[in-house]
C-alpha cells in the first residue's frame, strides 16, 4: 500500500494518500524485524515499499518518519543482508528471489544513500554483481522464465523497479538491461 498511496498522492495531491502512506511506513518501521532470518523475500518487499515512500514523499513526511524509515532500512535491510550468521542464498539464486531481494535492497540503498552511504554502496555493488548472472539464466533463451508466468510477473516487477531506480538515480543500470 505504501507504493500505491505514495503514487496516488503524487498524482492527485490528495493528502489522504500521504497520510495513509506515512501511517503504513511508521507501522512497518516499528516492526521488531522484517522476517530476515526466515524469509528474506519479505525484506526485499518491505525495503522496496519503504524506499519508495521515503523517496517519493520525502519533503512531505515528518522528520520523525524520515528518521525512522532511514533507520529501519539500515537495521532491517542493509545490516541483515550483510549478516554472515545465516545463509542468504538469494545472491546466488537464479529465480525471483534474486530479483525481489536485490531489487528491494537497491531501491532502499538509492533512496537512503545520504543517510547510510557505506552500506548503500555495498548493497548496490553486491546486487549488480549477483543480478547479472541470474538474468542470463532467467530470461534466456528469448525471454523464457523457468518459474512460469506468475513468478515472471512477480520477479520482473522488482527487476524493472531496480533498473528504473538505477537509471533515474545514477544514469545507468551498469549494463543489466543489456543482458541477453
Residue ranges, per PLM feature:
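Aromatic-lined, polymer-binding surfaces characteristic
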Residues: 1-180
Amino acid at each position: 500500500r505504501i507504493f500505491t498511496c505514495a503514487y496516488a498522492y503524487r498524482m492527485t495531491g490528495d493528502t489522504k494518500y500521504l497520510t495513509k502512506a506515512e501511517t503504513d511506513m511508521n507501522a512497518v518501521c516499528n516492526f521488531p524485524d522484517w522476517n530476515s532470518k526466515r524469509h528474506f523475500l519479505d525484506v526485499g518487499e518491505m525495503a522496496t515499499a519503504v524506499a519508495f515512500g521515503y523517496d517519493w514523499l520525502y519533503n512531505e513526511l515528518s522528520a520523525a518518519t524520515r528518521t525512522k524509515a532511514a533507520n529501519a532500512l539500515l537495521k532491517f535491510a542493509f545490516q541483515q543482508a550483510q549478516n554472515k550468521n545465516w545463509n542468504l542464498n538469494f545472491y546466488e539464486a537464479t529465480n525471483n528471489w534474486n530479483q525481489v531481494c536485490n531489487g528491494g535492497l537497491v531501491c532502499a540503498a538509492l533512496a537512503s544513500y545520504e543517510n547510510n552511504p557505506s552500506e548503500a554502496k555495498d548493497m548496490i555493488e553486491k546486487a549488480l554483481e549477483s543480478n547479472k548472472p541470474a538474468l542470463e539464466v532467467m530470461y534466456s533463451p528469448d525471454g523464457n522464465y523457468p518459474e512460469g508466468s506468475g513468478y515472471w510477473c512477480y520477479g520482473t516487477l522488482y527487476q524493472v523497479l531496480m533498473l528504473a531506480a538505477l537509471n533515474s538515480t545514477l544514469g545507468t543500470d551498469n549494463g543489466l538491461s543489456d543482458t541477453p
